[in-house]
């Protein structure tokens, strides 16, 4: 994935000056840069970019807001799972805030909310698995199998390949 994003990053750097809407060009570039670092497992750098460029929950540029916040939640979950002393409150607060945001009337239709709601459901299940079931090592593999089965039941879900990766770790 990293090589693919090297090409995308190079493309964005070359094309950014030619985009008419400079604000949109900057958002697109920064989001590309965030994804570039995310797929290199550099979650702290990804979060720094996202926190700099995207104010929380703006309705103008909704597609960018949804992608940025989904990516932010992925980073917080990965850091919570991978770094022993990382504060899990970051994940829990971001997930709850995003749930409230997408649930607000007029932000998204019910059909468009569903993949994000399913994403949050799975993120919370992965979070709980890593902090409850992993205390008993004998439950690790059966727990992963259950989580993967639960994930496969979702027809519409955001970030499914990444969620699979998190479960398999």
Where are these regions (language model features)?
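Short coil/turn linking the two alpha-helices of tandem helical-hairpin repeats
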Residues: 2, 22-24, 39-41, 61, ...
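TPR-repeat structural position
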Residues: 5-6, 43-44, 82, 88-91
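Solenoid-like repeat scaffolds
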Residues: 13-24, 51-63, 97-107
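Residues that mark the junctions of alpha-helical repeat units in TPR/alpha-solenoid scaffolds
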Residues: 26, 65-67, 115
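Extended, well-ordered alpha-helical segments in internal regulatory regions
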Residues: 72-83, 127-134
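C-terminal non-catalytic interaction modules
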Residues: 89-169
């Amino acid at each position: 994935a990293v090589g693919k994003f090297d090409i995308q990053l190079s493309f964005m750097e070359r094309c950014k000056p030619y985009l008419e809407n400079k604000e949109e060009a900057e958002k697109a570039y920064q989001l590309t840069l965030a994804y570039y670092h995310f797929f290199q497992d550099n979650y702290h750098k990804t979060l720094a970019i996202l926190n700099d460029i995207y104010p929380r929950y703006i309705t103008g540029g909704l597609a960018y807001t949804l992608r940025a916040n989904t990516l932010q939640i992925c980073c917080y979950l990965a850091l919570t799972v991978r770094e022993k002393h990382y504060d899990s409150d970051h994940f829990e607060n971001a997930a709850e805030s995003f749930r409230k945001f997408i649930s607000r009337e007029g932000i998204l239709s019910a059909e468009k909310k569903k993949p994000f709601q399913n994403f949050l459901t799975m993120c919370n299940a992965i979070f709980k698995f890593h902090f409850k079931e992993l205390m008993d090592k004998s439950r690790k593999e059966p727990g992963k199998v259950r989580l993967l089965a639960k994930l496969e039941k979702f027809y519409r879900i955001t970030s499914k390949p990444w969620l699979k990766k998190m479960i398999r770790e």
